[in-house]
């Protein structure tokens, strides 16, 4: 069954891990406390603060305690959905103020543009919130790349290391898993996607292999038609 859609990870795949850890996370860590204090009463933020209380098991946590929990999760690189949502809100302010520009590897930009021209549907699946995904590509160093993508998926579709998440994504895309090529730099994610029936290709930008999966160091080496 030929590949018709391409689902890509971001961190370590389309974009440098260092951009996330050296730029985005420090920016969120610096600006999140003031953002939460300023906007805590707004419905969108308040919903996420309640989710933090629920996930942490501290139903009575005040705003300052919630901030402490969030900063702890950032330090742990915890994939908590309410944290990702709040980080996305903070990053949006940074992008809109031109304090942040999304990093996307030039080879990924050029190849995804070619794939779009060739008729492939492109989708993103990342542990970062959909809002954060849109910002990385919509406010990137290469300009607005959002027209390339047909949709975005985050942890609301399920954990990235569980096959069921990829089954749900295939259903949302409306294609059999065998028609979808998944790209990632994480072996366990590739294993989960393959278990769901997707084609896979690993990105090892510093070289090496992702056991059991075709592995490349650049998007230019990926041939969806050969999967």
Curated annotation (Swiss-Prot):
Keywords: Amino-acid biosynthesis, Hydrolase, Magnesium, Metal-binding, Methionine biosynthesis. Pfam families: Hydrolase (PF00702). This is Enolase-phosphatase E1. One of its GO terms (molecular function) is magnesium ion binding. Gene3D superfamilies: 1.10.720.60, HAD superfamily/HAD-like. Belongs to the HAD-like hydrolase superfamily. MasA/MtnC family. It catalyses: 5-methylsulfanyl-2,3-dioxopentyl phosphate + H2O = 1,2-dihydroxy-5-(methylsulfanyl)pent-1-en-3-one + phosphate. The lineage of its organism: Bacteria, Pseudomonadati, Pseudomonadota, Gammaproteobacteria, Pseudomonadales. NCBIfam families: enolase-ppase (TIGR01691). It comes from Azotobacter vinelandii (strain DJ / ATCC BAA-1303). Its cofactor is Mg(2+). Binds 1 Mg(2+) ion per subunit.
């Amino acid at each position: 069954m030929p590949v018709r859609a391409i689902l890509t990870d971001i961190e370590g795949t389309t974009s440098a891990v260092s951009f996330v850890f050296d730029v985005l996370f420090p920016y969120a860590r610096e600006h999140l406390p003031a953002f939460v204090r300023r906007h805590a009463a707004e419905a969108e933020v308040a919903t996420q603060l309640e989710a933090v209380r629920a996930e942490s098991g501290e139903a009575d946590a005040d705003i300052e305690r919630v901030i402490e929990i969030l900063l702890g999760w950032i330090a742990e690189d915890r994939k908590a959905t309410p944290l990702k949502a709040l980080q996305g809100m903070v990053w949006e302010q940074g992008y809109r103020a031109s304090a942040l520009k999304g990093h996307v590897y030039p080879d990924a930009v050029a190849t995804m543009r070619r794939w779009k021209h060739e008729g492939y549907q492109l989708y993103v699946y990342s542990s970062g919130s959909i809002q954060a995904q849109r910002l990385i590509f919509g406010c990137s160093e290469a300009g607005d790349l959002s027209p390339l993508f047909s949709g975005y998926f985050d942890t609301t579709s399920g954990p990235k290391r569980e096959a069921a998440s990829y089954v749900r994504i295939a259903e949302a895309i409306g294609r059999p898993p065998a028609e979808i090529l998944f790209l990632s730099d994480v072996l366990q994610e590739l294993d989960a996607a393959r278990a769901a029936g997707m084609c896979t290709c690993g990105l090892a930008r510093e070289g090496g292999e992702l056991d059991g999966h075709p592995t490349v160091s650049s998007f230019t080496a990926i041939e969806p038609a050969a999967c």
